[in-house]
Amino acid sequence: MTGRQHNHQGQFAVPFFDLSASAGGDTQIDLASETAQDPDNQWVFPRQWLAKLGRRQTDALQMISIIGDSMVPLLEHDDTVMLDCSQTRPSPPGIFILDDGIGLVAKRTEIIPSTTPQMLRISSENSAYSSYERRIDEVHIIGRVVWFARRL
């Protein structure tokens, strides 16, 4: 389930998945689980707002929470992120939600040029965490982070 037209004209709903992307430890992901796909658990946005984000389509948008501190100061524990699941190739580089073989993580991800097999550099914003590399075929990229919300 991904973003869709809401009952009110001029609005769209983005499903909030009841799982978290780790910005530190690891979390396993099951996007097919009934808990993750609760149709009543969604955020509603004005369609005009979507245009300001540079997005025209809503069908590939999803929301999840961030846990941990590896992406501080950019993303903090309990932030909610919107990801575009149509963007699964890190070119250009950016912040992605991915399953790196250990668990679901939010990380800065980029393709390392001139590598065979093709490799990804996966890094945190927080310098207390080391960057690491994975073969692109070892990683399942869920989507690019395009927006976030934070409690004050």
Show where each model-derived region lies.
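Acidic/glycine-rich C-terminal interaction modules and beta/coil loop segments
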Residues: 50-152
